[in-house]
């Protein structure tokens, strides 16, 4: 349907969108009942050009190419539209060398990955297990861990995802559908285990703790779980091996933590250090088909609407 063009308020900018990224969480939000608002424009991530600024925002920002984050977090108006109004900080400069489609891949996947890397601490010379290393988040996390000097072991559930993880820099990728992950990790680390785990699904990966895949005093970073609620955890392993369990929700980072993530990410983007994967593009009028493609589970990278 048609909406009137929004106008920015104090401290806000209006972005003329050229691309809208669709994450699995956007599909989940769409399916959730009851809906949070009577009328919703979906999607948190996108990229475009600032064309209008509100009071308190410098006029130098007009014309800037930007990528945006959390557009539809706790508010109804996301990026599957022509214009979005956001607080100024949520529109981050996009390097000229990057396309708008690539910029629309960044918000949730790249910020989740960089926050995971920061929580893992110094990674130089260490070994990291990245579950789902061929996923949108895992692909970025693998690249970033390698940039920080780590050796990455990844997991993947298909040949295509394995190939993506290897291209991201993983030195070994375990097909978790064909090979028991725990014994293989111990084999690859000569029985020592890894220094850190960056995990997309706590409900399935937490069981590996009792197999000692994570070294004593290691760090386990959890950014998601296919099953939530009460889950079994081997507390004895956590306690007696002094495991540091760190969980976070990328939508709800503390301001200083998010600023640090954006600063780190922006440096890599300016230097052209990261690969970006656009799985497939659709037109805005094809939003339904785009969501169905995400739901199919066959995407490699981020599905993007071109606006």
What residues fall within each predicted segment?
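Glycine-rich beta-strand-centered segment in the early N-terminal region that forms part
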Residues: 4-21, 31-72
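Glycine-rich phosphate-binding loop and adjacent beta-alpha segment
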Residues: 204-274, 307
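NAD(P)H dinucleotide-binding glycine-rich loop of Rossmann-like/cofactor-binding domains
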Residues: 59, 69-132
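Glycine-rich helix-loop-beta junction characteristic of Rossmann-like nucleotide cofactor-binding loops
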Residues: 118-123, 189-190, 212
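C-terminal capping/lid region of NAD(P)-dependent oxidoreductase domains
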Residues: 271-280, 288-307
């Amino acid at each position: 349907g048609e909406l009137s063009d929004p106008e920015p308020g104090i401290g806000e900018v209006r972005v003329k969108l050229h691309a809208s990224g669709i994450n699995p969480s956007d599909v989940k939000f769409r399916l959730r009942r009851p809906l949070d608002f009577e009328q919703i424009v979906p999607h948190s991530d996108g990229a475009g050009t600032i064309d209008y600024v509100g009071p308190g925002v410098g006029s130098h920002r007009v014309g800037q190419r930007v990528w945006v984050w959390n557009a539809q977090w706790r508010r109804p108006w996301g990026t599957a539209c022509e214009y979005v109004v956001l607080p100024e900080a949520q529109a981050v400069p996009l390097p000229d060398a990057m396309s708008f489609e690539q910029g629309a891949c960044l918000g949730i996947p790249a910020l989740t990955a960089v926050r995971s890397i920061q929580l893992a601490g110094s990674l130089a010379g260490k070994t990291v297990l990245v579950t789902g290393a061929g996923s949108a988040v895992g692909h970025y996390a693998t690249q970033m861990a390698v940039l920080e000097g780590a050796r990455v072991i990844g997991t993947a559930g298909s040949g295509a995802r394995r190939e993506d993880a290897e291209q991201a820099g993983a030195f070994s990728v375990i097909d978790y559908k064909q090979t028991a992950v725990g014994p293989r990790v111990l084999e690859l680390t000569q029985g020592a285990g890894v220094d850190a785990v960056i995990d997309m699904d706590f409900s399935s990966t937490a069981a590996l703790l009792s197999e000692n895949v994570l070294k004593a005093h290691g760090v386990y970073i959890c950014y998601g779980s296919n099953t939530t609620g009460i889950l079994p955890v081997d507390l004895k392993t956590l306690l007696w091996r002094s495991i540091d369990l760190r969980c976070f929700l990328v939508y709800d980072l503390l301001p200083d933590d998010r600023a640090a993530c954006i600063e780190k990410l922006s440096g890599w983007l300016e230097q052209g250090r990261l690969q970006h994967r656009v799985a497939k593009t659709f037109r805005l009028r094809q939003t339904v088909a785009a969501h169905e493609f995400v739901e199919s589970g066959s995407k490699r990278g981020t599905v993007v609407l071109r606006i």
